[in-house]
Amino acid sequence: MKIMAGLDKPTSGEIWFDGKNVTGTKVQKRNCSMVYQQFINYPNFSVYENIASPLKITGIKSDEIKERVGKVAELLKLSAMLNKKPDELSGGQQQRTALARALVKDSDLILLDEPLANLDFKLREELREELPKLFEDRDCIVVYATTEPSDALMIGGNTATLLEGKVIQYGKTLEVYNKPENLISAKVFSDPPMNIAEITKRGDNCKFTDNDVQWKSSAKIKDGTYKICLLYTSDAADEG
């Protein structure tokens, strides 16, 4: 995300945005907003000043600034805290302030690095519903990094599953969820976590690789060694 924002340089490759190569574009010329997992606010500014800061440097009139700050503050439950300083806020309130500062600006690109991670459960659930609606009204691209499958499903759009910086699968979120192309993508959306076991198939016989448990299988697959997902359901538990 820092590379997309222009804060870090790529070691290789290029960055394209809206059909343009922006690899060498300076940070100041990238109309981008970013929220880190760890909140970052100006300690000497009030909540209002923190949220309004990206608007003031663009020369927007004070009345419009006040209106925009008011709307995003109401959305993020910050209206009663606009005159407070960051050190007077809880961790969740500080994260909401950082999120409000990113949303108040008409950015072409919004980068969100687990923005709901430090919020309490109730507000997290509320924002999961509100954020997609907010993004729909904006003519911008939103990149949302998360380790929570429920966040990805609620936000919608397209999803890329990553492993060690490499894209494993990319597509519509529901397509990735319903039709994972590999075990890694399947694990991402697995709740509860999957139980993975290695088996060996010879003819109609299957057995676990690490023990002597065997069974008959009519699966139409070639003989060989495979990894399978074991599903434990409440019905199976009831049957003992």
PLM segments and residue spans:
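The feature captures the helix immediately C-terminal to the Walker
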Residues: 1-2
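Helix-to-loop junction immediately C-terminal to a conserved catalytic motif
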Residues: 5
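A position-specific signal in ABC ATPase nucleotide-binding domains
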Residues: 8-9, 56
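Conserved coupling/switch loops of ABC nucleotide-binding domains, chiefly the family-specific signature
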Residues: 11-14, 164
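Conserved ABC transporter NBD signature motif
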Residues: 13-21
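ABC ATPase nucleotide-binding domains
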Residues: 31-33, 37, 41, 45-182
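ATPase nucleotide-binding modules
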Residues: 181-227
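Conserved small/polar residues in nucleotide/adenosyl-binding loops
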Residues: 232-240
